[in-house]
Design a protein with these regions (language model features):
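Soluble ligand-binding/transfer domains with enclosed cavities or grooves
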Residues: 1-99
Length: 99
C-alpha cells in the first residue's frame, strides 16, 4: 500500500486549487478539505477510499453545502506524488503532493 498520508493540492473544475489532507482512518484513506469551496467547505470529507481496492466514494453537494451526499468513485495512483480521484459520471480531480 503506497503512503498517501499528508497534504495534497488539487485543481477542482471551475474552482481554485484546493488543499486536502489524507489520513488513514478505520482502514480507509479519508481526504478532508483544508480549503473548501461553495459546495463542500473546509473541514468536510471530499472522498474516502479502501486502500486495498482504490474503490470508494466522493462527496458532492449543492452551493452552500446543501443536500450533501456520497457518490461512487475510485482513486488512481499515478506516482508517489500524483493521484487522481474519479467521481463516477462527474469528472475527476488530479492532486499533487504539497511538500
Amino acid at each position: 500500500m503506497p503512503e498517501l498520508v499528508g497534504e495534497w493540492i488539487g485543481k477542482y473544475h471551475g474552482h481554485f486549487e484546493e488543499v486536502i489532507r489524507i489520513n488513514l482512518q478505520d482502514g480507509k484513506w479519508i481526504a478532508t478539505k483544508i480549503t473548501g469551496d461553495e459546495n463542500v467547505p473546509a473541514g468536510e470529507i471530499t472522498w474516502r477510499v479502501d486502500p486495498t481496492t482504490c474503490i470508494g466514494e466522493g462527496q458532492i453537494a449543492g452551493q452552500g453545502f446543501l443536500k450533501p451526499s456520497f457518490v461512487p468513485g475510485h482513486l488512481e495512483i499515478l506516482s508517489p506524488s500524483r493521484i487522481i480521484f474519479h467521481w463516477e459520471e462527474l469528472g475527476q480531480v488530479e492532486y499533487r503532493r504539497d511538500d
